Amino acid sequence: MKRIAVLTSGGDAPGMNAAIRAVVRQAISEGMEVFGIYDGYAGMVAGEIHPLDAASVGDIISRGGTFLHSARYPEFAQLEGQLKGIEQLKKHGIEGVVVIGGDGSYHGAMRLTEHGFPAIGLPGTIDNDIVGTDFTIGFDTAVTTAMDAIDKIRDTSSSHRRTFVIEVMGRNAGDIALWAGIATGADEIIIPEADFKMEDIVASIKAGYECGKKHNIIVLAEGVMSAAEFGQKLKEAGDTSDLRVTELGHIQRGGSPTARDRVLASRMGAHAVKLLKEGIGGVAVGIRNEKMVENPILGTAEEGALFSLTAEGKIVVNNPHKADIELSSLNKSLS
């Protein structure tokens, strides 16, 4: 394989630029030409395919976002869109593609593979909801951003003896909420993977203030409900505290990636090129126990809950490459 391309698709994630850089630099070291596909699958179909060299990626490892830009392109789910994209790839002499994105992006890579075109998937999403990898590119940065914001909110919450419901991203996965909540000593962590009762949360808030607590911090995954709706339900369940709600929003997607995300993205990008060099396609790169692994992209792209909860309060991870997490005390004070 002498000529490959790289694209980013779906929601952006810190570390995508580091992955692109690694793909380009590794490809050059392997004697391969590398092209950038701008604007994801939409750009592929439109022929926005341009050569990249070491200078193109010389100053991007520390930048958030993706310099190749990203776009959602549902038309690629249709055969017509796929064939147009492949036509453009062949026109530019591209023999393989590295796709950086979430499960929607993986579906596109899977379609390319089904048409006999080698594609490698890299997990680029802050949600950490990709099967077959312990961590996704961007997750660590998003958790760190959420942690910093929650720490600041705790300061003002303590000053006014307030309860804060803080909504974080994650789509249908509770990973950001879980990690950021534990890291900040949140009083309650509400995630889609675990059931909860409003009356229990109200009782916990009341007990905390009666014991002299100066604040109550509730970290809420967006996949459960909005912070505004959750706050309203708390009041309906009898909460009488001075309540505020905050949605952290897209700040979690931006910013310079952490060292962990930069290293993870670099390792994954280089590994993807080595696979293509060996003629391997149709797989997604992941990290398990700090080692690079490959999984069939067909299974990796399938959506579904990554967690289920046992009666004992233990998370059973449907993704076998994620560690089990004890949740028996998560709906109690972690302060």
UniProtKB/Swiss-Prot annotation:
User: What's any GO biological process attached to this entry?
Assistant: canonical glycolysis
Q: Where are the transmembrane segments?
A: none
**Keyword Transferase part of the UniProt annotation:** yes
Q: Can the keyword Endoplasmic reticulum be found in this entry's annotation?
A: no
The similarity comment for this entry is:
Belongs to the phosphofructokinase type A (PFKA) family. ATP-dependent PFK group I subfamily. Prokaryotic clade 'B1' sub-subfamily.
Q: Which GO terms describe its molecular function?
A: 6-phosphofructokinase activity; AMP binding; ATP binding; fructose-6-phosphate binding; identical protein binding; metal ion binding; monosaccharide binding
Task: State the UniProt keywords alphabetically.
Answer: Allosteric enzyme, ATP-binding, Cytoplasm, Glycolysis, Kinase, Magnesium, Metal-binding, Nucleotide-binding, Transferase
The taxonomic lineage of its organism, from the top, reads: Bacteria, Bacillati, Bacillota, Bacilli, Lactobacillales
Q: Which organism is it from?
A: Streptococcus pneumoniae (strain Hungary19A-6)
Positions with a binding annotation for ADP: 21-25, 154, 185-187, 213-215
Q: Where does ATP bind?
A: 11, 72-73, 102-105
Quaternary structure? Homotetramer.
What protein am I looking at?
ATP-dependent 6-phosphofructokinase
Q: What is its EC number?
A: 2.7.1.11
Its cofactor is: Mg(2+)
InterPro entries reported for this sequence: ATP_PFK (IPR022953), ATP_PFK_prok-type (IPR012003), PFKA_ATP_prok (IPR012828), Phosphofructokinase_CS (IPR015912), Phosphofructokinase_dom (IPR000023), PKF_sf (IPR035966)
